[in-house]
C-alpha cells in the first residue's frame, strides 16, 4: 500500500488494478484520514487518468448495495453537478421523458451539494420516497420503468470519505465518479460533466465499465447538462471508439436562451418547474428538457440522431406520456410502502 501511495506522491500514474487496491482500502475504512487526504490531493495535482477513474469506480461498485435488474436494459442520465449554474433539475425532469419512451431509467442522485435543490430534494417535494429498499427499486423499474436510487443509501461506504472531502473543500476524483457508479448494471448512459477537458477520457472510462454506448456532454457555459446558451460539446462512445462533436440548439430546431433563463430555485420551486415542463408549458425550461431528453434518447440508441430525439421528446410530452410516468411512479410507490 505504501508503495502505491508513494507512486502517486511522485506524480506517477496508477494502473486500474493499483487504483482498485487503494480504493478498496478507502471504502473498507482502513486508510487513515491523513493518508486519504494526501492521496486525493496528490492525485488532483497529478491529474486523474481514465485507468484511475475506472479503478476507483469499480471498487465503489463492488461495495455498493446492488439493485437487481436485467443487465444492459436500464440507463441513467445523471451528471456530476458542480457547474454552479443554479439551474432547475434538468436531468430529473428529462428522466420521465426517457421512461415514457420505454427506456427503464435507474436515476442515480443525491441531495443538493452546490445548488439549492438536488435531485433527491426535488423528488421528495414531488412525493417520491427516496428511502426505498433495493427490492422496491427493482419493483418500480419493472412496473413503471423508472426508479430513484438515493446515492447515500446504495453507497453506504462513502461514509469513510465524507469528512475528508468536506475538510479539503476542493473537488477531487469523487466529484467525477458519482455518475459512473450506478448500482444497476447499465449498458447505455448519458452523463453530464462540469469539466470539458475530461469529455473524451470519461467516455473511455464508461467503456471500461461495460457501457456499450454512452454520451458524455458539457454544455455551453460549462454546464453539466446540454444548454440552450450556445455550443454544446459531447463525446460519443460506441464500438470501443470515442468521437467528439459539437451541437447548438439551432441545429435541432430549438431557440437559444441565456443561462439565466433556466435558473431554478429551492425544491418546491423546482418541483413546480418540473410539473410545468411535463405539462408542456412553452419556454426555456421546456426546450432545455427537450434538448437533454433528445441527447438521452440518442445515447440510448432509441434514435439515430439528437434531432430525432428532440422530436420524439416533444411527442412524449405533448401526448401526456411523460407526465403519466410521474403519476405512475407515485401510484406504484404506494403499493410498495403498503407492503
Swiss-Prot record:
Q: Which InterPro entries match?
A: Anthranilate_Pribosyl_Tfrase, Glycosyl_Trfase_fam3, Glycosyl_Trfase_fam3_N_dom, Glycosyl_Trfase_fam3_N_dom_sf, Nuc_phospho_transferase
Tell me the residue numbers annotated for binding anthranilate 2: 165
Q: Where does 5-phospho-alpha-D-ribose 1-diphosphate bind?
A: 79, 82-83, 87, 89-92, 107-115, 119
Bound cofactor: record note: Binds 2 magnesium ions per monomer.
UniProt cross-references to HAMAP family, sorted A to Z: TrpD
Record-given protein name: Anthranilate phosphoribosyltransferase
Write down a Pfam family by its short name: Glycos_trans_3N
The protein's organism comes out as Listeria monocytogenes serovar 1/2a (strain ATCC BAA-679 / EGD-e)
